Swiss-Prot record:
Belongs to the methylthiotransferase family. MiaB subfamily. The lineage of its organism: Bacteria, Bacillati, Actinomycetota, Actinomycetes, Mycobacteriales. It holds the Pfam family Radical_SAM. This is tRNA-2-methylthio-N(6)-dimethylallyladenosine synthase. It is an enzyme of class 2 (transferase). Binds 2 [4Fe-4S] clusters. One cluster is coordinated with 3 cysteines and an exchangeable S-adenosyl-L-methionine. It comes from Mycobacterium tuberculosis (strain ATCC 25618 / H37Rv). It is found in: Cytoplasm. Residues 197-433 form the Radical SAM core domain. Catalyzes the methylthiolation of N6-(dimethylallyl)adenosine (i(6)A), leading to the formation of 2-methylthio-N6-(dimethylallyl)adenosine (ms(2)i(6)A) at position 37 in tRNAs that read codons beginning with uridine.
Length: 545
């Protein structure tokens, strides 16, 4: 996967929320008084006299950096703001409130955030009523440092208290003083908050928050906290509700989904190491749910019961994203990755034995401190043997506060870049060979919007196959809509996508397509990313596994 891959660039680019979203049920959590909502909308109660002209509702924009966890949380931030009376800003307009949901995994995430904050400073000076809020992992890490570097910011909040955003914005407006509120522990599951979803046809469902691993390169556990699992009943209730709204595909999110069941928030629920496999099977019993994905598992805890559930559950997609990080056992030890290369390859072998057509993708880090040419050669060897459908490759980024930042042997940039390019070239050749093997085959595609960067030029539409591959196809008829399901035949292959110019073989209209036509958003949504291919905008894998 080249450096232009969505997962490699996700911390460099913010994904703004835009467009209308599905209505959500009333929210009764910690937000500003709903009187603000009524006043903003110009509504007066019975007996209040003649209608009084009110100021228009304040508009907002959420800019998202980083992983699927952040995309999920940003949908909750948008839902909270709309429940408090804010209105989503239209594309191209200047929002009254700009919220940055930040990433702290790589150094260029910091640089990009503070660069964008600097660009907003003139707007803030010209319009003091505009508000800027910074949340997410970088805010949790930097805390008061955000205001030192960007004193025009109005609100700083962390990963554990996103439900406080509307209250903090109102308090900052009233007191004319910046508000900083960083909670040290999870206050409530983000999934319990109102949501303004990014898609009519695909949804994120968080099954846990936090991580109990201690990878030396990763700062996420110190920012998200130790793992806390939602109850299966709550998760399945959310999935059923989404399906009732027309959603066809859900992605189950966790920093380490294999560990689900050992840290339930409800003390009445016993530890259950088989809980994740059971959850997958339970999703298979939900009528109308066509696709289930999950991200991401940890190789050290990947068990055969999960492989069996994947193979035997009708709607679990034949796709697995399992981070490798390095093919060198010596580097894996230095990373505190509690598995070795042969164990990883053994898991892949068992997955392919049970699901021969599974598309397996991974994450790789190049240039970890102390990595020798021999270590890097071991990574290349594992990549050749594993035959990944795609590999999302990152150059090691030194993060203050992580053990790896203190290690000797930090590599020169030129060495890391040269190895990175060699790895990219190898993986792209493997990806191309795998995709060429699909030419002539029929694929089922869940039609998306915005996944193809040149769709308007080529007159193609785009979507994802069941295995996550990106497919650009010629519809040949105007009735195909985002959210519909089609089958088509692959006519051409590239490393990052398939082309299907043979026309649509079958077309099934869906309620999700109806919802999209009725006014759902027209922006890019990764269908259970990480998938295989290059959508316009996508999120990187959730933290570090």
């Amino acid at each position: 996967m080249s450096s232009a891959s969505p997962l490699a660039r996700c911390c460099d680019e913010a994904t703004p929320s835009a467009g209308p979203r599905a209505a959500q049920p009333p929210y009764h959590g910690p937000v500003t008084s709903m009187v603000a909502h009524d006043a903003a909308a110009g509504v007066t109660g019975e007996g209040a006299g003649p209608p009084v002209r009110r100021a228009p509702a304040r508009t907002y924009q959420v800019r998202t950096y980083g992983c699927q966890m952040n995309v999920h949380d940003s949908e909750r931030l948008a839902g909270l703001l709309e429940a408090a009376g804010y209105r989503r800003a239209t594309d191209g307009s200047e929002a009254d409130v700009v919220v940055f949901n930040t990433c702290a995994v790589r150094e260029n995430a910091d640089n990009r955030l503070y660069g964008n904050l600097s660009h907003l400073a003139p707007r803030k000076r010209a319009n003091p009523d505009m508000q800027i809020a910074v949340g997410g992992c970088l805010a949790q890490k930097d805390r008061d440092a955000v205001l030192r570097r960007a004193p025009w910011v109005d609100v700083v909040f962390g990963t554990h208290n996103i439900g406080s955003l509307p209250t903090l914005l109102e308090r900052a407006r009233h007191n004319k003083v910046a508000q900083v509120e960083i909670a040290e522990a999870l206050q409530q599951f983000p999934s319990s908050l109102p949501s303004s979803r990014e898609s009519a046809y695909a949804a994120w469902v968080s099954i846990s928050v936090g991580c109990n691993n201690s990878c030396t390169f990763c700062i996420v556990p110190s920012l998200r906290g130790r793992e806390v699992d939602r109850s299966p009943a709550d998760i399945l209730a959310e999935v059923r509700s989404l399906v009732n709204d027309g959603v066809l595909e859900v992605t189950l999110l966790g920093q380490n989904v294999n560990a689900y069941g050992v840290s339930f928030a409800d003390p009445a629920l016993p530890r259950n190491r088989g809980a994740f496999a059971e959850l997958l099977r339970a999703c298979g019993d939900i009528d109308g749910l066509e696709r289930v994905r999950f991200t991401s598992p940890h190789p050290a805890e990947f068990t055969d019961d999960v492989i069996e559930a994947m193979a035997q559950t009708r709607n679990v997609c034949p796709a697995l994203h399992m981070p490798l990080q390095s093919g060198s056992d010596r580097i894996l030890r230095a990373m505190r990755r509690s598995y070795r290369a042969e164990r990883y390859l053994g898991i892949i072998e068992r997955v392919r034995a049970a699901i021969p057509h599974a598309a397996i993708t991974t994450d790789l880090i190049v240039g970890f401190p102390g990595e020798t040419e021999e270590d890097f050669a071991a990574t290349l060897d594992v990549v050749r043997r594993a035959r990944f459908a795609a590999a999302f490759t990152f150059q090691y980024s030194k993060r203050p506060g992580t053990p790896a930042a203190q290690l000797d042997g930090q590599l020169p940039k030129a060495v890391v870049q040269e190895r990175y390019e060699r790895l990219i070239a190898l993986q792209e050749q493997i990806s191309l060979e795998a995709n060429r093997a699909l030419v002539g085959q029929a694929v089922e595609v869940l039609v998306a919007t915005g996944e193809g960067r040149k769709d308007t030029v080529t007159a193609r539409m785009s979507g994802r196959a069941r295995d996550g591959r990106l497919v650009h196809f010629t519809a040949g008829q105007p009735r195909v809509r985002p959210g519909d399901v089609i089958t088509t035949k692959v006519t051409e292959a590239a490393p990052h996508h398939l082309i299907a110019d043979a026309g649509v073989l079958t077309h099934r209209r869906t309620r999700a397509g109806d919802a999209h036509t009725a006014g759902q958003p027209g922006r890019a949504v990764g269908l259970g990313m990480p998938g295989v291919g290059l959508p316009v905008s996508a999120a990187k894998p959730g933290g570090c596994r």
